[in-house]
């Protein structure tokens, strides 16, 4: 899968995770179905893998994030930042085929710059760096 397809999948996974936090009564598959006609099937498949992985490992992922965050509780982090962190930690630590930390961190930072606040990129970078060092 090309990097751009993976980036699209991560961005889609972020959108789905974000939406399901505000509408937990709607299944995440419903949100993915909205994009099925407009995106490459491999993007949908990888996004589904990420969302499923994050949801299945949410407690352990949040525990790793919390252990690396000296000043922020996971539930108090901005929803976008929290879900970007979850995606990156899933891909680094919980995926069946984990990706390299530097790739996960770079992807997360770029997505944070695109979707988060002006501080999101540096926040995500610093926290994921701590997650990497804690491993």
UniProtKB/Swiss-Prot annotation:
GO terms for biological process: DNA-templated transcription termination; transcription antitermination. Transmembrane segments: none annotated. Keywords: RNA-binding, Transcription, Transcription antitermination, Transcription regulation. GO terms for molecular function: RNA binding. The keyword Cell cycle does not apply. GO terms for cellular component: cytosol. It holds the Pfam family NusB. CDD domains: Terminator_NusB. It comes from the Bacteria. InterPro entries: NusB-like_sf, NusB_fam, NusB_RsmB_TIM44. Belongs to the NusB family. Involved in transcription antitermination. Required for transcription of ribosomal RNA (rRNA) genes. Binds specifically to the boxA antiterminator sequence of the ribosomal RNA (rrn) operons. This is Transcription antitermination protein NusB. It comes from Bdellovibrio bacteriovorus (strain ATCC 15356 / DSM 50701 / NCIMB 9529 / HD100). The gene is nusB.
């Amino acid at each position: 899968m090309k990097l751009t397809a993976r980036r699209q999948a991560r961005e889609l996974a972020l959108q789905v995770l974000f939406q399901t936090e505000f509408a937990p009564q709607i299944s995440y598959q419903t949100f993915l179905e909205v994009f099925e006609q407009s995106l490459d099937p491999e993007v949908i498949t990888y996004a589904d893998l990420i969302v499923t992985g994050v949801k299945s490992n949410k407690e352990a992922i949040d525990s790793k994030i919390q252990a690396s965050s000296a000043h922020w509780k996971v539930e108090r982090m901005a929803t976008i930042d929290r879900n970007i962190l979850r995606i990156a930690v899933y891909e680094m630590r919980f995926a069946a085929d984990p990706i390299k930390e530097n790739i996960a961190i770079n992807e997360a930072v770029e997505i944070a710059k695109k979707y988060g606040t002006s501080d999101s990129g540096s926040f995500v970078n610093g926290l994921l760096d701590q997650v990497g060092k804690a491993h």
